[in-house]
A protein has these predicted regions:
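Beta-propeller blade termini and top-face loops
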Residues: 1-155
Length: 155
């Protein structure tokens, strides 16, 4: 659903989107390409990652790997890269990174599992903060390495 002032538009009934009972969804809009929208959909038969190139008017299912929605009943988080229109992160027990718009993903781990939230610096996509069951970890190299959660100073 999108909102423009007081008007709302339901996007999940548009062409190409999953039909039937829809569970928890994760949504991300590319800050680089504003009409690109991703939706991770919990659905018994049609669950997976959907992408729209026209602001949600039409959708295509681009990935149905189960690992991406392993805990859809618990949390489903998507994060669009702040510099790369094809960059997308899916958080779960592990986290998954796509560099091809969501068609494929590489799986990675921060020092602790059960990844819940991710912040990507708007001006530098190499600076990130991952929030998980162990606290928070910082990366300055796009997730190639992460700070430890042991003895990390907090304010």
């Amino acid at each position: 659903m999108t909102t423009t002032g007081t008007a709302r538009t339901e996007l999940s009934t548009n062409k190409g989107f999953a039909k039937g009972t829809l569970g928890i969804m994760g949504i991300a809009v590319s800050p680089v390409k504003a009409d690109r929208v991703w939706a991770m959909v919990e659905n018994k038969d049609q669950g997976g990652l959907y992408r729209s190139e026209d602001g949600g008017a039409t959708w295509s299912k681009i990935n149905d790997e189960r690992k991406l929605r392993q805990r859809a009943w618990y949390y489903t988080r998507l994060y669009a890269d702040t510099q790369d229109a094809d960059g997308l992160y899916v958080l779960n027990v592990r986290y998954h990174k796509s560099t091809d718009g969501g068609k494929s993903f590489e799986t990675a781990n921060a020092p602790h599992g059960d990844h819940h939230d991710l912040w990507i610096a708007p001006e530098d996509n190499q600076r990130m903060i991952m929030a998980d069951d162990g606290g928070a970890q910082v990366s300055t190299d796009g997730g190639a390495s992460w700070s430890t959660y042991h003895n990390q100073p907090t304010a």
